[in-house]
């Protein structure tokens, strides 16, 4: 091992949402003098306004700190800040691959949560040295010993050296830094070997093109060097190298073991995929870094501008977003009801919310979003397999041999008193119980297989409400399973409205159709003629509601007199309404599309 690297430590921080990860990062930066008190602002590494507001970390960030340890040596610490949310699990695994150690932050008042566990298992898979920290000990409800036991029982880590700390009050920060220096191993790697580096994040800078965050494992990268990206064999010339300390500054080279920024004439962020391997074009390394995969979106929804004139603006906004987010996909789509728009793909629900919120906030767009749907796998009668992300594209019933839907394995951590309510919720969502184990006397871990389509709507909100906010959820994709699914069409006056169709389980179709029709009846305004709202599977109508017509009294000016005169007027009115119904089109208000989303309740 090169003696050169013995002063470098690469580590990340693992924590559940709100356990104080970003605050701890702020304190570490202040303690090492990387950021002066004047520059410090809360959640220093969460650059996006949205990240600060929701208190979550979305993109990975890095920062290099200089630290003089108690043994008098100077160390270079690279903190790689990872997103904690399960939607970004792949980004987390790539950030972990770039480290040798991790600080595990556990809230002294809450104990170990589902996402903490999921990330810890990933860290253990990457053989990281884990330094446990029990945070928020300044709170009156903190139970340090209890949490220490829980870390030992639930995760199986030896927690006798766990550092009690309070990131908010700055207690225990020095001790954490000492532990990093003494427990996390220095990186290995030979600066003379062929170049091998992993990209663990990339984003688009309007002046320099794509900026890649990399960790160099072998070799050295210098400006003017020709590099090659492994997954697509494209070659680029390195223009500049840099590090964040915490503001960007240029460096002359990055050697094995170091973490930094590479800018190399890359124009498209989709070329610099997270997890890809960079090597020297002239002297490539033997094998790429294992575990690279192209992230596939799991949840889809249509996004349409309310004003048709905003279409171009929406397209520009989506293009800019996708520059920074290689997991986000979009393609144009048209809908009879909503006009022109885009079909967007996301990693999960949080990702979807964030993208939509950024479109509305950063680009000031007013949007309609259709109900989220998942990717179904359809095998038709000829045996061809096709993946469908939009219910409107489903082939007719008689051509489908089998339909499969994605299933998730969900791990739910909860208090023992909420178990009943949670099991009931999972049962309602067609879940299949796999495991239930008690962690100590107060907490329980429940494992279920649940179809993704059932989780997409509001499973998370419901879970939080039945457990009074105490349950936490972590999930991974298990694979596709065959299910008895049907496409439910909504017809208005006999015309199908594509944006309202949904794919549902056959057992639920009747109930769902009835609910939908009732909802729509409330939101579609009255017309001069009656409007029929029907829910149908194929040609079979399973539910119907009618919006009654306005009634105009055409007989008001007939006093007494002959019945035939009155009949003539009534017939004439009836004719008029019939003609109107043939040519009239029903305006479907924005609320109708939202009604589809709310039907679940």
Curated annotation (Swiss-Prot):
This is Elongation factor 4. It comes from the Bacteria. One of its GO terms (biological process) is positive regulation of translation. Required for accurate and efficient protein synthesis under certain stress conditions. May act as a fidelity factor of the translation reaction, by catalyzing a one-codon backward translocation of tRNAs on improperly translocated ribosomes. Back-translocation proceeds from a post-translocation (POST) complex to a pre-translocation (PRE) complex, thus giving elongation factor G a second chance to translocate the tRNAs correctly. Binds to ribosomes in a GTP-dependent manner. It catalyses: GTP + H2O = GDP + phosphate + H(+). Belongs to the TRAFAC class translation factor GTPase superfamily. Classic translation factor GTPase family. LepA subfamily. It is an enzyme of class 3 (hydrolase). It comes from Anaeromyxobacter dehalogenans (strain 2CP-C). It is found in: Cell inner membrane. Residues 6-188 form the tr-type G domain. It is a peripheral membrane protein. Keywords: Cell inner membrane, Cell membrane, GTP-binding, Hydrolase, Membrane, Nucleotide-binding, Protein biosynthesis. GTP binds at residues 18-23, 135-138. SUPFAM superfamilies: EF-G C-terminal domain-like, P-loop containing nucleoside triphosphate hydrolases, Translation proteins. Its EC number is 3.6.5.n1. NCBIfam families: lepA (TIGR01393), small_GTP (TIGR00231). One of its GO terms (cellular component) is plasma membrane. The lineage of its organism: Bacteria, Pseudomonadati, Myxococcota, Myxococcia, Myxococcales. GO terms for molecular function: GTP binding; GTPase activity; ribosome binding; translation elongation factor activity. Its main location: membrane. Signal peptide: none annotated.
